[in-house]
Amino acid sequence: MVSALEVKSIKDSNETLISLDDYIRNTLPSQLHEILLEEFQNQDFSRGQDVSNSTHDQMIDHTLELTSDLLRNALDKQLMEVQSRTLPVRQSNQLISWSFAQGLIIGQLSVVIFLIFFVKFFIFTDASSKMDNPLPSKVSKSYLKNRRESSSIKDKRKGVLVKEESGETDLHGSLQLNDILEKTYYNVDTHSAESLDWFNVLLAQMIQQFREEAWHKDNILTSLDSFIQKRSSDLPDYLDKITITELDIGEDFPIFSNCRIQYAPNSSDKKLEAKIDIDLNDKITFGMSTRLLLNYPKKCTAALPIDLAVSMVRFQACLTVSLITAEELEFTTGNKIDDNEKNGYYLVFSFTPEYKIDFDIKSLIGARSKLENIPKISNIIEYNIKKWFAERCVEPRFQSVKLPGMWPRSKNTREEVIHKTEDESSKTPHS
């Protein structure tokens, strides 16, 4: 084979400058022929003897074969060098293309799996027929002082424990309570429960008057709109403006029944409370519409319309009502309390944890392909409403209302005005 140095010496020995094409066509074959002859002369004598005895045609054929072998080896060497340089690039390109395709496939599969689980467990899951009532999770904002359970109290002026005064106070309260029960001919142990029909009639008149004023003056709609506008800043950014679409305050009235007076628990028979059963069969509906801004933070580019209508169709509970003094009620909130609220009497009411509220919740999601009445959404809304109710007025939580002064005052005195008809006014004699 011809080395690189020999080829270079051949090129340097050429005194005339010729083009590359002429060199390949004319000069290169003659030079290869000379090189081959030199190679044959340098071989062994036996090989040289065979070549000299061979004919000229055989020598040419042998030369062509040897030339083709040399060219083939040179081309193979060049191809191997080119392949050794281009193979890592091809492998890296294949690796990049395969990693991109692999990531695309994995991403699509993850989205499909997420959609399958979402549709199966969120949309088509049947709502549970019975849901437990949630319990309050935070510390109560106010509570009753149970001073009667302790045997001593602390005198704030002197800073000493006065046991005798505490015992005298408890004894005086017990005697006063027994005196009230005796003079009202009420026996806590044997007295039968009352129906409260008279109270239902008075309460129904009040509710009816409230409904008439609400519908004629649009007080409820105005109050709700102003409330939503004030709280709109507290809404998350992915929710659009809330619009009221339906409002129904009902047409039936609650029924109070089975009222009984009994001693309050953990009071050592020194405090009374009333237990009243409440039953309301009505349909109170609140409907609203909004949009879920999916393409956050670019608003309004992709929005999902949502329509909700929540109706309360049944409410059953046991109401506990008691009358306490301001000293027995201790506030634990950080809000400032007026001095007037620290005196007087308070009406305290709460509901037992065995209450029952039935809802009829309708939901509609989407613009064209709409999802209607998704059970999971109904469960979430029902749970949050019950949680809101439990954290405010379900035992041990309670609501307190300060009672106004009952002593007659001149500023509160009123007189009914009787309007006479035309017939009565004509019959009235004139002086």
Curated annotation (Swiss-Prot):
Give the Cytoplasmic compartment stretches of this protein: 125-431
An example GO CC term for this entry is: ERMES complex
Can you cite a GO biological process for this protein?
Answer: mitochondrial outer membrane translocase complex assembly
Where in the numbering of this chain does the SMP-LTD domain appear? 192-404
Q: Which residues cross the membrane?
A: 104-124
- Pfam families in alphabetical order: MMM1
Which ranges of this chain reside in the Lumenal compartment per its record?
1-103
Q: Which UniProt keywords apply?
A: Endoplasmic reticulum, Lipid transport, Lipid-binding, Membrane, Transmembrane, Transmembrane helix, Transport
Keyword Flavoprotein listed: no
Q: Where in the cell is it found?
A: Endoplasmic reticulum membrane
Does Transport count among this protein's keywords? Answer: yes
Q: Per UniProt, what is the membrane topology?
A: Single-pass type I membrane protein
Q: PROSITE patterns in the record, alphabetically?
A: SMP
Principal location listed in the UniProt entry: endoplasmic reticulum
Comment, domains: The SMP-LTD domain is a barrel-like domain that can bind various types of glycerophospholipids in its interior and mediate their transfer between two adjacent bilayers.
User: According to its UniProt entry, what is the function of this protein?
Assistant: Component of the ERMES/MDM complex, which serves as a molecular tether to connect the endoplasmic reticulum (ER) and mitochondria. Components of this complex are involved in the control of mitochondrial shape and protein biogenesis, and function in nonvesicular lipid trafficking between the ER and mitochondria. The MDM12-MMM1 subcomplex functions in the major beta-barrel assembly pathway that is responsible for biogenesis of all outer membrane beta-barrel proteins, and acts in a late step after the SAM complex.
Record PANTHER family: SMP-LTD DOMAIN-CONTAINING PROTEIN, TEX2 PROTEIN-RELATED
Quaternary structure (record)? Homodimer. Component of the ER-mitochondria encounter structure (ERMES) or MDM complex, composed of MMM1, MDM10, MDM12 and MDM34. A MMM1 homodimer associates with one molecule of MDM12 on each side in a pairwise head-to-tail manner, and the SMP-LTD domains of MMM1 and MDM12 generate a continuous hydrophobic tunnel for phospholipid trafficking.
Task: Kindly provide the name given to this protein in its UniProt entry.
Answer: Maintenance of mitochondrial morphology protein 1
List the source organism. Candida glabrata (strain ATCC 2001 / BCRC 20586 / JCM 3761 / NBRC 0622 / NRRL Y-65 / CBS 138)
Name of the gene this protein is made from: MMM1
